[in-house]
């Protein structure tokens, strides 16, 4: 990718935001992702990395390469979300098999990009624009993405709790300097439910920050 920097720059010119997704540990993701990120970041583009770490059965050598690639990528992105493939077993409703394991990992990467893109592109009652997202994600370092869903009584509160304690990521909401909250629901959701969910998340990250400082 080093020899293709000019081509990469030409392809990225005019972009406001770039997502770099990769499975770390292999040659392409580990080697190329940091180069693409460097070019994008140097162009002043908001650069977000969403990457996966190998399954444990892929071996220590691949995990070592992944850790090195993640460290290199972190130097050139504004925000970096790292998803350990091993944790997919903790959230999957189905049995993770050798055949579908890598497809599940790809789906998580796709969902990460779609979730962040939807904040800007999908109309909502309270709309966020690109400036809002940029103010949170610019030069943020490691980022945490939590997703929760629930039904029935207390659904908003239960979904918020699930998002805060999502087992998918190694990071936590502790120490966060900013939070973007996206609530998707049926049209009849009550204002109280929204306030409960947002309040729970806000209190959680500010409380944890206070304990860390």
Q: Where are the regions that the model predicts?
A:
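Tubulin/FtsZ superfamily GTPase core signature
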Residues: 1-212
């Amino acid at each position: 990718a080093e020899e293709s920097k000019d081509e990469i720059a030409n392809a990225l010119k005019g972009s406001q935001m770039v997502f770099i997704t990769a499975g770390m540990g292999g040659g392409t993701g580990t080697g190329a992702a940091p180069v693409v990120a460097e070019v994008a970041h140097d162009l002043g583009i908001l650069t977000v990395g969403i990457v996966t770490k190998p399954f444990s059965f892929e071996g220590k050598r691949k995990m070592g390469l992944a850790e090195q690639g993640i460290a290199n990528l972190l130097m050139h992105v504004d925000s970096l979300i790292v998803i350990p493939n091993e944790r997919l077993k903790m959230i999957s409703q189905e049995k993770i098999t050798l055949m579908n394991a890598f497809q599940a990992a790809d789906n998580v990467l796709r969902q990460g990009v779609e979730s962040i893109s939807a904040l800007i592109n999908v109309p909502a009652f309270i709309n966020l624009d690109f400036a809002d997202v940029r103010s949170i994600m610019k030069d943020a370092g490691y980022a945490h993405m939590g997703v929760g869903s629930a039904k029935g009584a207390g659904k908003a509160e239960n979904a918020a709790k699930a998002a805060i304690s999502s087992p998918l990521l190694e990071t936590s909401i502790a120490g966060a300097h900013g939070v973007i909250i996206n609530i998707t629901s049926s049209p009849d959701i009550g204002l109280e439910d929204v306030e409960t969910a947002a309040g729970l998340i806000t209190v959680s990250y500010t409380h944890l920050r206070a304990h860390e400082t």
